[in-house]
Amino acid sequence: MELQSQPPKLVEEERSVPSLPRLSGVHPILYAFYGPDGRLDRAALERQVDACLGAGCHGIALLGLVTEVFRLSTEERLDLVGWAAARIAGRVPLMATVAEVSVHGQLDFITEAKRRGADWVVLQPPPVKGVPEREILRFLGEVADRSPLPVGVQNNPLNMEVSVSSDALLALHRNHPNIRFMKAEGPAVSVAGFAREASRTCDIFAGHGGIEWPTNLRSGCQGLIPAPELVDAQVEIWRLWSSGETERAEALHRAVLPIIAFMSRALPLLVAYGKRLMAMRMGLETVHARLPEPGVTSFGIEEIGRFAALLGPLHAEPGAALSPALKRLAGLG
């Protein structure tokens, strides 16, 4: 891990950075689908993009844990960026997570991701155990300062081996103004103080599938980066909440909460079953695994089929409304 910059100071430094629109709303992070030969399936990726755009998403993300990033080669990751950018065609911003473990590796990846159409990049604490927090901040700060794209930082203590404190994230943002958003994952009560403090100058996104989506909104978050299988419901929750219809937003959240809970027990289960639910809702008949994959059970597939019937299909047409099945489920009529 390359650590060449000075340690961050807990004071704000004035730097000139380009102004950008604030990010908000629902930015689903796509699954990686494979063909029977184990190679990436571009058509399935494009179908996901279409479904998310049809649901009215505000952006699209790639290459996080949901995308099985550590199963992909660097070239495969960049292929996904290029394919997604071509399909999105500038309609919403595209953010790509950076998985390389050196400063130069990350900067090389960011440069190429920008060339292929990414608008933002997301950095994570490098997966190197035993490194002092200050050194992790130096690493992230150097990449952010030299990145040709605006940067977000994901901190996920529940699903990542290395994470940093909320105070460290605040210092990182103060000292490196190219860091424009944070994905702060964890129980809403744990991140609320951070979200309210940071959201004055930084866009704060929740995660964990949106399991606390309305609570996250109350706590100061401006957006959500979930897996895509509930994108229509979660975009509608955002729309209702933003228009002041908070009770209807809460009702819709309660309707899909059992499905989110089913997916949230463990990351391998989300990848195995969430991907299959997304496939069912998009009309894909077969999901091919890239081995090794956690085994799916017949009962699990039955449950996913039941969820798909409750939710109804995802439509690719722009401005597609919630399915009648999902409206009935939420009592929205």
Could you tell me what each predicted segment is?
Residues 2-3, 7-17, 27-31, 55-57, ...:
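C-terminal alpha-helical cap/extension of soluble enzyme domains
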Residues 3, 7-161, 171, 180, ...:
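Active-site beta->alpha loop and helix N-cap motifs at the rims of alpha/beta catalytic domains
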Residues 50, 111, 214, 239, ...:
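Surface-exposed charge patches
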Residues 62, 123, 154, 226, ...:
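Residue-level detector of family-conserved "landmark" positions at structurally sensitive sites
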Residues 63, 95, 102, 161, ...:
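Residue-level signal for alpha-helical context at structural boundaries
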Residues 77, 81, 106, 191, ...:
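A general structural signal for well-ordered alpha-helical segments in protein cores
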Residues 145-146, 157-267:
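Catalytic alpha/beta core domains of metabolic enzymes, predominantly
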